[in-house]
Curated annotation (Swiss-Prot):
GO biological process: protein folding; response to unfolded protein
Coarse class of the protein's main subcellular location: cytoplasm
Function of the molecule: Possesses chaperone activity in vitro where it inhibits aggregation of citrate synthase.
Gene it is expressed from: Hspa4l
Protein name: Heat shock 70 kDa protein 4L
Induction: By hyperosmolar salt stress and heat shock.
Pfam families found in the cross-reference section: HSP70
Known partners and oligomeric status: Homodimer.
Keyword Nucleotide-binding: yes
Protein species of origin: Mus musculus
Listed GO MF terms: ATP binding; ATP-dependent protein folding chaperone
Amino acid sequence: MSVVGIDLGFLNCYIAVARSGGIETIANEYSDRCTPACISLGSRTRAIGNAAKSQIVTNVRNTIHGFKKLHGRSFDDPIVQTERIRLPYELQKMPNGSTGVKVRYLEEERPFAIEQVTGMLLAKLKETSENALKKPVADCVISIPSFFTDAERRSVMAAAQVAGLNCLRLMNETTAVALAYGIYKQDLPSLDEKPRNVVFIDMGHSAYQVSVCAFNKGKLKVLATTFDPYLGGRNFDEALVDYFCDEFKTKYKINVKENSRALLRLYQECEKLKKLMSANASDLPLNIECFMNDLDVSSKMNRAQFEQLCASLLARVEPPLKSVMDQANLQREDINSIEIVGGATRIPAVKEQVTRFFLKDISTTLNADEAVARGCALQCAILSPAFKVREFSITDLVPYSVTLRWKTSFEEGTGECEVFSKNHPAPFSKVITFHKKEPFELEAFYTNLHEVPYPDPRIGNFTIQNVFPQSDGDSSKVKVKVRINIHGIFSVASASVIEKQNLEGDHNDAAMETEAPKSEGKEDVDKMQVDQEEGGHQKCHAEHTPEEEIDHTGAKAKAPPSDKQDRINQTIKKGKIKSIDLPIQSSLYRQLTQDLLNSYIENEGKMIMQDKLEKERNDAKNAVEEYVYDFRDKLGTVYEKFITPEDMNKLSAMLEDTENWLYEEGEDQPKQVYVDRLQELKKYGQPIQMKYVEHEERPKALNDLGKKIQLVLKVIEAHRNKDERYDHLDPAEMERVEKYISDSMNWLNSKMNAQNKLSLTQDPVVKVSEIVTKSKELDNFCNPIVYKPKPKVEAPEDKAKTGSEHNGPMDGQSGSETSPDPPKGSSQHTDSGEMEVD
């Protein structure tokens, strides 16, 4: 079973795997542990990762990058429209209203949904993992920003399915970093001690996230998390780009922003300059050759200028830090350490802002690039039954409060209940009880839209079906289980109706007692029900019910029973209670239909097959080209002696014609055409190659056979001379060996004489394979006879027995060590020196 963690970044991706007792970040086919989040589509194939990044400038309109923020959003979303201005490729509205990318692929304009684009990238990462692990990969854990909403999370899950991956968990990036930090710590406080509080700061290319986590031995709890989804390394790049665009407009009279290719080149150079300024405070040059209109441009920048330029961005670093401390109810002195990850945290001014706020040094013990992927791989290992991992519990949180809304029966009023508050532990389940006589609908939405970086608060609608009144006409008691699952996604997990069946003989008593709660008010029966008597818009607060569950431990929190609950329990005992599961119809916001998802999966399979066929075609073409260059080079050197001048001229012309064909009409041919062309060349080239190989290897093969013949001849000569080493060999068998060796020598001499009479351009009389076969036959025939071991000479048994009889003690010697046991009944000395007498 594979254990893979994937850091699905905005700019780059990392893959970590669990193997050899640890976590290892793996490299791709370019020996690079970092795979760019880029997909370039061409007329015949796709390039993904490093190959696609090299085409960002050359294939501007069809190279997709920077698409992570488009997940789960409609085309009309303000964020999508903002990103649209930044992106050099075209965005398109899909039939379901979501955002798609319009590119040219296989010589036609085609739209791709964001789930398909991310699916392509994940499929590439899957392939890289399989190449490293040498086995299929299916299960994985994928990282996402902690601020992703339900729609965005479901979109990433769909992309994983498109790639053929089974995502065991969508893990918040800061939580993954916390796991990578905490699981190896041996000095964490025990469970009964005060936890160690650590702040994790992650500023990547597009977003800034902060979380506070409490650590005990074998336990991690996320206390609070804050973020700025619109602050990252690319904002600092944009500040530099805007500065140089203005400068070049004044200095060179060119408008860079009108030329997308030039703008991309400037972005690349500004990113390099930003990284150089992080390590160097002096003036640094910016030089770009043939930038626009054949102009070479140049400028310079230093760190002080850069920090002044980005002052407004640096001012946004502190507010999330203050917010996370307020939410966690912690002071600066409560923080044990501050860990930073993400590429943008390498900017000295960002580090300075963090240090100034916490008044303590920051720690850089974690790998800023790979910590998220390593944390995901650890989580995958914890979830996998194939790996034994140190026990470590992880409690994440809900970043936004979630509220349920439903219609009441009184004048079409509505009821509301906040089921999960902000920073509520997750994964978590709650059971809510409703009193209803008919099917009803629950609407889930984010309570405070101003806290959510998403324009629509809706999560989804859930219809509880098959709800009917009780047999006595009363409302049915419907228990609804709501859940924030391991992926951080809200759902209505199940619903059931409690059906009361009165026992015979107790009908009147039961009826009276079931009415008692009604007179006391239905709120007393259940903490989360709607007061039907008050119409209009009302709110109630969700309280912990006895059914409330914490998923990661499986324990249930039991509430102490009240007096009223005791009376209800007595009523239940007098009646038969039956729980019936109810069907739930879910309508989730921005959820892909199963048919659409299946079509995406099918299309991805077709594109993978197209890539495979194109690779095979290119490999066949490259094989022809390689053969032409290699053979032509050897034809003028090592093969020259093995071909006649006429044949050489003919073959040289054929090679030259093939080379010209490759760059003309043979530029774009089916795979089989290249295979046939290579076979045609080999038909003429292989005989020459064979003569050369035979000529090179024949002397060694002949020498080996000659040595073996000489060794056997020496044994035959020694046997004739009555050498005692071979006097055990059978004379008849030795005669057979002598005859075999004589025949072998005659065969060898005749073949060598015949070969010496031939020129190098002629086919050999004897092949190396025949000589090797002859050598093996000689070994098989002669060796069992001439190397038969001498029989061992055994000493006579009588002498051995005689010797053993005289090895005992002589008269007068002590024979205590070998004396036999005394007979029963006779007296003997004991260890204590006493004598036993009968």
